[in-house]
């Protein structure tokens, strides 16, 4: 989770608390993961309270890894400000340090939500918490709009 500080100053951020819990187990044929996050905001007029749950899996397939992820975010401060995210990605190793990857991801927003996809090769729901400058900074025009992303790339680790 992150706060896009370029969208404006974070007010009262020092009083926010987060509870994070995650569990994963490698079954050999697949590796499921579950994550839960809860945000407690001391000043709901400035910061939203929410909880988020994510379920995903990573499965060896055709010499690479196929990853699938689904998450739900429940905004506990605003009505109709929840979101779903679904994504999948396949990564194929060309060498020990170089991978090709491709995937697709989508965020489905409620009518009062404007959550966006963070640029990059992953399949997780990321949040833009500033209700006045949603998705691309154009204000509330993007409330209730869904966001999709198709990505391909190459990753080399040095």
Regions found by a protein language model. Give the residues of each.
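Outer-membrane beta-barrel "beta-signal"
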Residues: 141-158
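Detector for outer-membrane/organellar transmembrane beta-barrel domains
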Residues: 1-93, 103-106
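Outer-membrane beta-barrel and related beta-rich outer-membrane complex signature
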Residues: 46, 112-136
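Intrinsically disordered, low-complexity segments enriched in small/polar residues
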Residues: 6, 26, 61-62, 85, ...
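A contiguous, mid-protein "functional segment" used to position or interact
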Residues: 86-123
């Amino acid at each position: 989770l992150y706060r896009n500080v370029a969208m404006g100053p974070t007010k009262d951020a020092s009083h926010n608390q987060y509870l994070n819990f995650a569990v994963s187990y490698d079954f050999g044929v697949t590796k499921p993961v579950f994550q839960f996050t809860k945000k407690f905001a001391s000043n709901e007029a400035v910061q939203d309270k929410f909880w988020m749950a994510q379920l995903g899996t990573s499965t060896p397939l055709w010499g690479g890894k196929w990853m699938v992820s689904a998450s739900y975010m429940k905004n506990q401060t605003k009505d109709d400000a929840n979101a779903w995210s679904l994504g999948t990605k396949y990564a194929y190793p060309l060498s020990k340090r170089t991978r090709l990857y491709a995937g697709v991801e989508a965020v489905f927003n409620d009518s009062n939500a404007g959550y966006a996809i963070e640029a990059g090769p992953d399949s997780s729901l990321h949040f833009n918490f500033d209700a006045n400058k949603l998705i691309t900074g154009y204000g509330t025009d993007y409330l209730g709009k869904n966001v999709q992303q198709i990505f391909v790339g190459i990753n080399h680790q040095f």
